[in-house]
A protein has these predicted regions:
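Generic recognition of short, well-ordered alpha-helical segments
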Residues: 17-21, 46, 74-78, 158
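Helix-loop-strand module that forms the ligand-binding subsite of alpha/beta enzymes
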Residues: 49-133
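N-terminal beta1-alpha1 ligand-phosphate binding loop
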Residues: 1-35, 167-169
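Glycine-rich phosphate/pyrophosphate-binding loop and the adjoining helix
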Residues: 23, 131-195
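A short helix->loop->beta-strand "cap" motif at the edges of active sites that frequently abuts
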Residues: 2, 97-101, 141
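N-terminal beta-loop-helix "entrance" segment that forms/cooperates
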Residues: 32-55
Length: 195
């Protein structure tokens, strides 16, 4: 088990500047595996066994996506529901991701000032992406600080190249901002809805 799995979830990566540049930079990183969800599953069902094997083969997982209606694109949401099953990712017997590291890389057209308590949205980008940190907590994973680029519509080529360089550094060296305990949280006593 080694390396970083970068799961790219951009609905139109061929016409993306930022996510395409980040994915290309990650592909050039010897310790990274880039997995494009939209290219792998353009319109068919997601292969759960294949996806779980990819996750099991890596110790760091980074979900890379453009912020879409203050969340992730639909294919990534579908992927999470399909792959992160009770008994595998969480709940009784669900220890497959325990003590791995999860991170997100998010781009957004809105500028950074929009994502502040006094900004246009009244919340920070960390607050908007909190569900991903909660996913890490629920599955027993460490959580990296988010890698973000805001104001992408105004991003020139030099800023984009610098962002891609910083992204690779982040993929290789970022330390978790929240560490999982690694101890059994007695999830067997947690009641989960059935049906």
């Amino acid at each position: 088990m080694a390396g970083t799995l970068v799961i790219v979830a951009h609905p139109d990566l061929a016409h993306s500047r930022v996510n395409a540049a980040w994915a290309a930079a990650a592909r050039d990183c010897a310790t990274c595996t880039v997995h494009d969800l939209y290219a792998t599953y353009p319109d068919g069902p997601i292969d759960g066994a294949h996806e779980r094997a990819l996750l099991e083969a890596h110790d760091r997982i980074v979900l890379q996506f453009p912020l879409t209606w203050y969340s992730c694109p639909p294919r990534l949401s579908e992927w999470m529901v399909t792959i992160l099953k009770r008994g595998w990712a969480y709940g009784p017997g669900g220890r497959a991701l325990q003590l791995k590291t999860l991170g997100i890389a998010v781009s957004t057209g809105s500028n950074g000032a929009d994502y502040s308590p006094d900004g246009r949205y009244g919340h920070t980008l960390d607050a908007v992406t909190l569900p991903f940190e909660l996913l890490a907590i629920h599955t027993g994973m460490h959580y990296l600080p988010a890698f973000t680029l805001t104001g992408v519509r105004d991003c020139d080529d030099a800023a984009l190249a610098q962002s891609a360089m910083h992204y690779v550094r982040h993929l290789r060296h970022a330390a978790p901002r929240r560490c999982a305990s690694g101890q059994d949280d007695d999830r067997a006593k947690t009641r989960y809805p059935t049906g």
